[in-house]
Amino acid sequence: MSLYRDEGIVLRTQDLGEADRIVTLLTRRTGLVRAVGKGVRRTRSRFGARLEPFTHIDVQLHAGKSLDVVTQVDTLHAYGSVLVTDYPRYTAGVAMLETAEKVVSVEKDPALRQFLLLWGGLRTLAEGAHDPRLVLDAYLLRSLAVAGYAPALEECAHCGVPGPHREFAVHAGGMVCSLCRPAGSVKPSPAAVALMVALLRGDWESADASAERDRTECSGLVAAYLQWHLENGVRSLRLVERA
Amino acid sequence: MYEGAVQNLIDELGRLPGVGPKSAQRIAFHLLAAETADVHRLVNALVAVKERVRFCAVCGNIAEETQCRICRDPRRDDTVICVVEEPKDVVAIERTREFRGRYHVLGGAISPIEGVGPDDLRVKELMARLSEGRVTEVILATDPNLEGEATATYLARLLKPMGLKVTRLASGLPVGGDLEYADEVTLGRAFEGRRALDF
Ligand SMILES: [Zn+2]
Ligand SMILES: [Zn+2]
């Protein structure tokens, strides 16, 4: 059984040789897959547009020794063509794709919840109903939660005593009580913490009503938390633009 | 593994883009069998490219003097600038003979995942050229793929307050490809049919 079919989202592409491209996919059933798209940089290739980042595809692959080979591909949704017309949404989307790859990290280990989360995140971003930075932060928090790194926001990350607490320590795992608080804790505004809670729960009504300065603070906390938990960090986060 | 010099050569060749271990080995043995004079010509060409070739101070294209051939040509139209990613895109567009204006080579596309942002490209240099006031149209001819489109979107937004005509090559260029692979006819048509961007 060397041929298999799956559904996936293109996370990243890298040029290979003269006209080929390596695509990294997060698939519904197989998890993270790296595969070669042959000849896709040639302008006559019908595959090219379908193997661009952000595309949700139905794909048939031939399992190879090191890399699989794409043998057939159909577009289910081309989120990229919408996102690319709006720079803040595009950069938020790229940070989501990069995070998905780094959070899942192991190839061919099924990660259905991560796939569904990314798909939902890209759909929300493409619909454009919310501030792209909020959509990104919601995605980052939930993606970490699915991976087992949910920040403690309503109880102390160290001893578990119920809050509300005033201080946040990235390396302790979230909010900390006054007895547990390690050196280097920061004191975020209660509104920024409430925004993180809303984003983690999917409470868009509260999130959309948040003030700009709380969004900025929330993004800072989420970014610090993400960079701490992902070994190599998420490079594209630095280039995300505010709407 | 081969001994010393041969293996060294195979390793060096293998680091070139598009050359796998098998090709590297094939090229190495070809050179080993070739006439000494032929190999010296290749060596000289390699050294010359590093010693003589630099980037045009005006547009960023490949040049053998301070300015490239196109920037030095007084017959070119100063009112139109075509923005491309790489010097090889200039070559592709010149082949169409459709364009008589000037170029601006960015040195790549915005690629957040590779850590390449607007500050890593020759965007400031472009803005400086435009602020001189002679240019009336900017053609965004970045690659017809996602990163090229995103770069065009970024530039269009940046250029908007300047009140210039900003155009993008007409689609018909296959999406997902590299500009350099487009044939002359398709690329020429894309130039003729370029559309104004209104952001
Ligand atoms: Zn505690
Ligand atoms: Zn020049």
From Swiss-Prot, chain A:
It holds the Pfam family RecO_N. GO terms for biological process: DNA recombination; double-strand break repair. The keyword DNA damage applies. GO terms for cellular component: bacterial nucleoid. Keywords: DNA damage, DNA recombination, DNA repair. SUPFAM superfamilies: ArfGap/RecO-like zinc finger, Nucleic acid-binding proteins. The keyword DNA damage applies. Gene3D superfamilies: Nucleic acid-binding proteins, Recombination protein O, C-terminal domain, Recombination protein O, zinc-binding domain. HAMAP family: RecO. Belongs to the RecO family. Involved in DNA repair and RecF pathway recombination. PANTHER family: DNA REPAIR PROTEIN RECO. NCBIfam families: reco (TIGR00613). This is DNA repair protein RecO. The lineage of its organism: Bacteria, Bacillati, Actinomycetota, Actinomycetes, Streptosporangiales.
UniProtKB/Swiss-Prot annotation, chain B:
One of its GO terms (molecular function) is zinc ion binding. InterPro entries: DNA_Rcmb_RecR, Rcmb_RecR, Rcmb_RecR_Znf, TOPRIM_dom, TOPRIM_RecR. It comes from the Bacteria. Keywords: DNA damage, DNA recombination, DNA repair, Metal-binding, Zinc, Zinc-finger. It holds the Pfam family RecR_ZnF. SUPFAM superfamilies: Recombination protein RecR. SMART domains: TOPRIM. PROSITE patterns: RECR, TOPRIM. GO terms for biological process: DNA recombination; DNA repair. Residues 79-174 form the Toprim domain. The keyword Zinc-finger applies. May play a role in DNA repair. It seems to be involved in an RecBC-independent recombinational process of DNA repair. It may act with RecF and RecO. NCBIfam families: recR (TIGR00615). This is Recombination protein RecR. It comes from Thermobifida fusca (strain YX).
